[in-house]
Amino acid sequence: MGDTTEKIILIMVTREDLFAAPFFYGNVDLDEEKLKESIENTNILYGLVSEDFDILHGSFDWLYGPVNRFVVEVMEEMEFYGPHSIFTSWLTATIKENEIKSQDHMHMNSFMSGTLYLTENPSPLMFKNPLPWRFQNNESAMNITGKLASNKYVYQPQKGEIIMFPSHVWHQIQSNDSEDPRYSIAFNVLPTGTLGNWDSTVNLKVIK
């Protein structure tokens, strides 16, 4: 009789996670007196968002320097060494009595977006997986911890933290359950100047 022993073939599996969305985190020191004065001097529309959409050159101009330094570090980390523009920035208010949270949204016509958190216990920020698949292996895929299986991630920021992420990532500000208003500055960034090479060269300029 022939040898009927089952042969076991070992298959070596390796893994490399490609095309991740880069998220960047940092901290900014906040001057409490300037912060209070700036919030008081900002006109908030409908109790939600500032009327001024260039607030880092307005009532919060003292924060432009530290925010821009963080932006420079992020852009250089992604190998964009040329000029850039923080072309929009605004104050966002999350207030309990409004009893609403933001709609799912992304930031159109922008490269990177960011948020600087100004007050204690900021509202969580939920991000949605930008990859196109929507299969999930089980209920745990809906939690906040999985990096590959999950299609959502909830970021719990702290006062003074600053975050930047690709503008195409859908996200949603969660509701405020505390009695105190929560404030943050959101902003959008574009690389400017000459980008690309050969037939892909483009010159970007932000006109305000």
Predicted regions and their residues:
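Non-heme Fe(II)/2-oxoglutarate
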Residues: 5-82, 90, 101, 201-208
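Extracellular-facing segments of soluble proteins and assemblies that are Gly/Ser/Thr-biased and enriched
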Residues: 82-98, 107
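Catalytic core of non-heme Fe(II) oxygenases with the double-stranded beta-helix
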Residues: 96-164, 195-203
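Short beta-strand His + acidic residue motifs that chelate non-heme Fe in jelly-roll/DSBH
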Residues: 102-105, 171-178
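A short hydrophobic beta-strand segment most commonly corresponding to one strand
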Residues: 114-115, 179-195
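Localized chelating/binding microdomains
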Residues: 155-157, 174-175, 181
